[in-house]
Amino acid sequence: MEKIGYLNFIDHTIELEEKFLPQFTEGTSQHSLLRNRIQALKTARDLISRESQPTRDELEFALPRIESIIHKMSKARDKYEPEDKNYKRFDPTVQVMTHVRAVILQALEE
């Protein structure tokens, strides 16, 4: 997948998660989790697009949230065989977030 593909995927994911945010009461753990995940995705988008350079604190904040997405999507994906439609539904998220994690780790090393 190319840079534009990653950015489109991340933007689409942000849009979907922002639609779910109002369903949770502010102050609940679900609301905080989703808000933090959206912020992590926005940080990743900024880093990959080079629109702005996220701070070290923003990158350190984003990394565990991205790793959480990878973990949860991998567990969901691995319940299915690679030919299954559900496997194919979860796999792109795992691949994109794995790339995002690598980019964040690289930025943190610099």
Predicted stretch roles:
Residues P64-D78, Q95-E110:
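Compact DNA/chromatin-associated regulatory and scaffold domains in nuclear/nucleoid proteins
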Residues Q30-E51, K85-L108:
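Short, charge-rich amphipathic interface segments used for partner binding and complex assembly
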